[in-house]
Every structure is written in structure tokens, then in C-alpha cells.
Regions:
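Bacterial Sec-dependent N-terminal signal peptides
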Residues: 1-26, 71
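Preference for long, solvent-exposed alpha-helical segments and helix-linker "stalks"
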Residues: 23-189
Length: 189
């Protein structure tokens, strides 16, 4: 019985230690996140960067804002394509349901505008976004996607080109209708 008591005490001590360490890590993530967000919004990008890297390494699923703001840090402030790729990959891994079509579209735009990937690689990313929800993609990317479909199918499958044209046009119209609604709401306020 003495062995049982010793074992139970050791087990409880271990569980308490694990729980406390998890709470400390969670608390540290929250503190670093708040510092990061405040620094980012104040445009103190160097300070934000340090906390952001900590969040990217240790608190990957804390908030989608780590990736929304992080994309700006990686692409516009640091101009670091490797970091931008990491933001893209981790955001899709940890927040797969938070607007993935737009994430694909935005990343394709970044690669395309900075000439960091081949047209084929950009098309493949746009294809993923289009398959999820074309209305979440930018109009320019819908055009680039359509151009990619045309280039790949004009000689072998013209019907696919026509079908894609109709589909893209419909999605552009949906986007434009959405913009019109926002303008009306904005003008009414």
C-alpha cells in the first residue's frame, strides 16, 4: 500500500506540473500575441516581428491574425518569400476553414507580382482556390486562372474553355454584385 500511495503522489505531482507548464505556455502565447498585435497595429514592425516569430513557432493555432498580419510582415515589410511561404502553409494547416480560397488567391498574387514562381505554379495555386470558392478570389486572379485554363485546353478541350469562361463570368458578376451592395450600404450610411 505504501508503494500505491507513493505512486499516486508522484502521478499527481507529474500531472500538476504538466498542467502548470501548459498554462504557462498558454499565458506566454497570449502575452506575446497581444504585444505582437499592438506593435503591428502601431506599425512597430521590428518589435512585432520578434513576437510574431515566437507565435509562428510556439502558438501556431492561437489566432488566424498571426497569419493575416504575418503575411504583411513577410511579404511587404521583410520581403521574404521563404517566410511568406511559411505563413501560407501554416495558415492553411492550422486554419483550413478560415477563407482558404482567398488565402490561395492572395498567395498566388504575391508570387505572380514578385515573379517568384512560374506561371504553372501560380495557376496550380489559383486552381486550388477556384475549386474551393471562386467568389473569394480577386477578379484579376479569376482572369489569370481563366487564361491558364485557356492555354492548357484550347487545342485539346475547347468545351472546357467555354464552360470555364461561363463559370468565371458568373463568378465575376457575383463579385461585382457584392461590391455594388457594399457601395450602396456605404453611401447610405
Amino acid at each position: 500500500t505504501m508503494k500505491k500511495i507513493t505512486f499516486l503522489l508522484a502521478a499527481m505531482l507529474f500531472i500538476t506540473t504538466v498542467e502548470t507548464n501548459a498554462q504557462d505556455a498558454s499565458r506566454e502565447c497570449t502575452i506575446k500575441y497581444n504585444l505582437f498585435k499592438g506593435d503591428f497595429q502601431s506599425k512597430k514592425f521590428d518589435d512585432a516581428y520578434t513576437n510574431w516569430i515566437f507565435l509562428m513557432d510556439n502558438c501556431k493555432d492561437l489566432s488566424v491574425n498571426i497569419y493575416k498580419f504575418g503575411a504583411t510582415l513577410a511579404e511587404e515589410v521583410r520581403k521574404d518569400p521563404v517566410l511568406a511561404q511559411r505563413v501560407y502553409d501554416q495558415r492553411l494547416q492550422y486554419f483550413p476553414t478560415k477563407n482558404p480560397a482567398k488565402v490561395h488567391s492572395d498567395y498566388a498574387t504575391y508570387l505572380f507580382e514578385n515573379k517568384l514562381a512560374s506561371d504553372d505554379a501560380v495557376f496550380k495555386i489559383l486552381e486550388k482556390g477556384y475549386a474551393i470558392d471562386p467568389t473569394k478570389m480577386g477578379v484579376k486572379n479569376l482572369y489569370i486562372y481563366f487564361q491558364g485554363v485557356t492555354d492548357r485546353n484550347k487545342d485539346t478541350n475547347p468545351q472546357k474553355v467555354f464552360d470555364t469562361y461561363d463559370d468565371v463570368l458568373e463568378n465575376v458578376n457575383i463579385k461585382l454584385a457584392g461590391y455594388a451592395k457594399k457601395l450602396i450600404k456605404y453611401n447610405d450610411s
